[in-house]
Amino acid sequence: MITWEPWRAPPGEPRIAEQPDVALARIADGAFDDLVERWARDVAAYRGPVLIRLMHEMNGFWYPWGDAANGNSPEDFVRAWRRVHRIFARAGADNVSWVW
């Protein structure tokens, strides 16, 4: 299972929730599509079963994708999740099961 956590944490630095460069609206608007598309193609090429847990615990304040960080809203979460899911579907990554 892959736990996909959209944040930036340089080695040796603490992980903090306030990271506006990875706000959900940016994901939903396509700022990271190149990265997501690359992952989707690689997962589709793998062909074995893959479980992806995308942006878990979204209702907490402790993650950059949480609804209390970076100006995120529940609507932003839904838009970002759907965008990532659509990209995987377009890539033919039908070997993915999405974990809630």
Roles of regions detected by a PLM:
Residues M1-W100:
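Substrate-binding cleft of extracellular glycoside hydrolase catalytic domains
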